[in-house]
Amino acid sequence: MNRTVFFVSESTGITAETLGHSLLSQFDTIDFEQVYMPYINTDLRAKALTQRMQEAADRDGVRPIVFATMLNNEIREILESGNCYYVELFEGFVEPLSRELGVPPSRKSGRSHAITKPSYYTKRIEAINFAMANDDGIRPDNFHRADVVLIGVSRSGKTPTCLYLAMHYGLRSANYPVTEEDFERGDVPQLVWDCRHKLFALTIDPQRLQLIREERRPGSSYASLARCQDDIRMAAQIYKRLQIPVLNTTSQSIEEISSHIIKALRGSGEH
């Protein structure tokens, strides 16, 4: 079953996207066609969007879902009048919270990031830069500066997890790909061993890994099931030798994987 979903906001749309994704993740039997519509901040843009909603309804045979964070009543009414199932993610909470706090809301869009301390914002930017500069084992000599180091076979989810940890937690995250060279010697370089206390392994079911690799290199030996099975098996032997935590990414979201890592780091006193 296919369903079109619009993420709509007067500002960047990050809040609508984040909350909407959390809700949609509970319905994994449906394929969602996701459309991002930030800066819908005029009547004209809102009316144009209702036309797109109608087109989606005509195409899919069912009305689209709209996740929105609209504080402008006029624009919200235009969107609600469209052929859609409208989910307002702010308004149901703003008024009750206003009554509890005893002050009126500012009704300004794009304010969800304003409460973040500048120092934390800077930390996240630095962490993102670190993750990008230390992706795919480019600089193992920098691992000692990392808060966390992920290890895993190619396409096991290392890079997106590192970026998520950087963006949402401000963690300096690096990763190291386990390669044929490591398999041949049955071990990883000393620089990886040196950071074993902050090392996490990512594994994945061979069948799932094959599908992911097939998208990248169709018909290649790299994407064959036999190669995927061998890579996972030999990597598991290395993880056992290192005696590090192993997280299976097959059926877990990046958010779930990251939460496990954060919990482990806090339990160890690293963060």
From Swiss-Prot:
Keywords: Kinase, Nucleotide-binding, Serine/threonine-protein kinase, Transferase. It comes from the Bacteria. Its EC number is 2.7.11.33, 2.7.4.28. The keyword Transferase applies. Coiled coil: none annotated. It catalyses: [pyruvate, water dikinase] + ADP = [pyruvate, water dikinase]-phosphate + AMP + H(+); [pyruvate, water dikinase]-phosphate + phosphate + H(+) = [pyruvate, water dikinase] + diphosphate. GO terms for molecular function: ADP binding; ATP binding; phosphotransferase activity, phosphate group as acceptor; protein serine/threonine kinase activity. ADP binds at residues 152-159. InterPro entries: Kinase-pyrophosphorylase (IPR005177), PSRP (IPR026530). HAMAP family: PSRP. Bifunctional serine/threonine kinase and phosphorylase involved in the regulation of the phosphoenolpyruvate synthase (PEPS) by catalyzing its phosphorylation/dephosphorylation. Belongs to the pyruvate, phosphate/water dikinase regulatory protein family. PSRP subfamily. This is Putative phosphoenolpyruvate synthase regulatory protein. It comes from Thiocapsa roseopersicina.
